[in-house]
A protein has these predicted regions:
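Switch/communication elements of ASCE P-loop NTPase nucleotide-binding domains
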Residues: 92, 96-157
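Short coil/turn segments at secondary-structure boundaries
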Residues: 17, 90-93
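Short secondary-structure junctions
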Residues: 79-86
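Coupling/switch segment of ABC-type P-loop NTPase heads
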Residues: 1-79
Length: 157
């Protein structure tokens, strides 16, 4: 896997709805990987789809503690970079992504620009690695090269 993120990666668009459906597969993990921008919309749609799949598996398996390995890896990656964040999830009505901090719920669009950029960047990398390694117990053990131009731009420490 090879990913490239340029200096124009500020997240300006936090979607409130999904306009078109994407196919998420090992092959599409590399889709637009060399473009110089972040796409929060695709990350949001993938996250929502994985949550739906995870909830379906909980019901089928009658295992209410079931966690989808790919989604769990992305959750951990995203949460590791957001101070005091306990959970990240999608609310359905109205449709939005939220971060739970200190028992309070914040919409992603309420986060600072640096936090949104960090979430989008780490979420996109983790999503692509998870999609590229669907058979691994821990998809984050996959390998790749990630180029980030001006790493500190729009990022929090």
């Amino acid at each position: 896997m090879f990913l490239n993120y340029g200096t124009n990666r500020l997240v300006l668009d936090v979607p409130l709805r999904i306009r078109k459906k994407h196919s998420f597969s090992k092959r599409t993990a590399l889709e637009r990987a060399l473009e110089n921008r972040l796409d929060f919309r695709t990350f949001f749609e993938w996250f929502r789809n994985q949550e739906d799949f995870e909830n379906e598996q909980k019901s089928i398996k009658r295992d209410w503690d079931y966690r989808d390995p790919a989604l769990e890896c992305v959750r951990k990656a995203a949460l590791s970079m957001l101070d005091d964040a306990e959970e990240i999830k999608v609310r359905r009505n109205p449709l939005r992504m939220v971060v739970i901090r200190n028992d309070k719920e914040y919409r992603v669009d309420q986060l600072s620009d640096g936090e949104k950029c960090t979430l989008a960047l780490l979420g996109d990398i983790a999503r692509r690695v998870a999609m590229a390694n669907p058979c691994r117990e821990n998809p984050m053990e996959g390998e790749g090269i990630v180029l980030i131009d001006e790493l500190d731009l729009h990022m929090h420490p």
